[in-house]
């Protein structure tokens, strides 16, 4: 705060702030000479630094462009591989679907064939049972007819010889019908 007061005191005593146009008193020549010497003497040094910096920047830009081109090439190659992989996946899916269809058709055909064989066996077994039952019924009917005939013959014909002959004739006729 003291310095601030001193500045105002000095300004008040010297009649304010003014511009000094005397070149020798201001040291402007010294500053310009110093800048000129620095430019002349530092031109080679500063030029080489700027040239190195320029070379480094250009090289960095070229490296970045090379990396960009390389990355672009790898991206294109990866996209080609992706497209090829998608084609292979699509082919595999199509082959899988075709194989599934063939397997299903084969299974359906096998199931139909198996069902047909089972149905034919069941039908043959049914016909066999039907024939067997028919023969058993026929045998029972013949047996009943023979028993009735024997009973009627015994009642109608008292003598044994006549009855035996009639029974034998009837049995022979019935056996002939069965065969």
UniProtKB/Swiss-Prot annotation:
Which Pfam family, just one, is annotated for this protein?
A: ATP-synt_B
User: Where does the secretion signal sit in this chain?
Assistant: none
**Which residue ranges run through the membrane?**
26-42
Coiled-coil boundaries: none
What Gene Ontology cellular-component terms does the record carry?
A: chloroplast thylakoid membrane; proton-transporting ATP synthase complex
Membrane topology, as annotated: Single-pass membrane protein
- Which UniProt keywords are present, listed alphabetically? ATP synthesis, CF(0), Chloroplast, Hydrogen ion transport, Ion transport, Membrane, Plastid, Thylakoid, Transmembrane, Transmembrane helix, Transport
Q: Could you give a GO molecular-function term held by this entry?
A: proton-transporting ATP synthase activity, rotational mechanism
**Which cysteines bridge via disulfide bonds?**
none
The main location is plastid
Where located?
A: Plastid, Chloroplast thylakoid membrane
The family annotation for this protein states: Belongs to the ATPase B chain family.
What is said about its interaction partners and assembly? F-type ATPases have 2 components, F(1) - the catalytic core - and F(0) - the membrane proton channel. F(1) has five subunits: alpha(3), beta(3), gamma(1), delta(1), epsilon(1). F(0) has four main subunits: a(1), b(1), b'(1) and c(10-14). The alpha and beta chains form an alternating ring which encloses part of the gamma chain. F(1) is attached to F(0) by a central stalk formed by the gamma and epsilon chains, while a peripheral stalk is formed by the delta, b and b' chains.
Additional notes on this entry: In plastids the F-type ATPase is also known as CF(1)CF(0).
What role is this protein assigned? F(1)F(0) ATP synthase produces ATP from ADP in the presence of a proton or sodium gradient. F-type ATPases consist of two structural domains, F(1) containing the extramembraneous catalytic core and F(0) containing the membrane proton channel, linked together by a central stalk and a peripheral stalk. During catalysis, ATP synthesis in the catalytic domain of F(1) is coupled via a rotary mechanism of the central stalk subunits to proton translocation.
- The protein in question is named ATP synthase subunit b, chloroplastic
Q: Which organism is it from?
A: Phaeodactylum tricornutum (strain CCAP 1055/1)
Traced from the root, the source organism's taxonomic lineage reads:
Eukaryota, Sar, Stramenopiles, Ochrophyta, Bacillariophyta
């Amino acid at each position: 705060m003291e310095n601030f007061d001193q500045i105002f005191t000095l300004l008040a005593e010297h009649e304010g702030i003014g511009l000094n146009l005397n070149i020798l008193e201001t040291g402007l020549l010294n500053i310009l000479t110093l800048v000129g010497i620095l430019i002349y003497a530092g031109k080679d040094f500063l030029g080489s630094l700027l040239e190195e910096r320029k070379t480094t920047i250009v090289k960095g830009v070229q490296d970045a462009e090379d990396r960009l081109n390389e990355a672009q090439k790898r991206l294109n190659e990866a996209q080609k591989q992706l497209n090829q992989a998608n084609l292979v996946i699509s082919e595999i899916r199509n082959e899988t679907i075709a194989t599934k269809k063939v397997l299903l058709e084969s299974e359906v055909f096998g199931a139909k064939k198996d069902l047909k064989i089972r149905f034919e066996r069941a039908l043959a077994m049914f016909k066999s049972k039907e024939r067997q039952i028919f023969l058993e019924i026929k045998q029972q009917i013949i047996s009943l007819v023979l028993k009735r005939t024997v009973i009627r013959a015994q009642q109608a014909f008292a003598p044994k010889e006549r009855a035996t002959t009639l029974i034998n004739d009837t049995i022979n006729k019935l056996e002939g019908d069965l065969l």
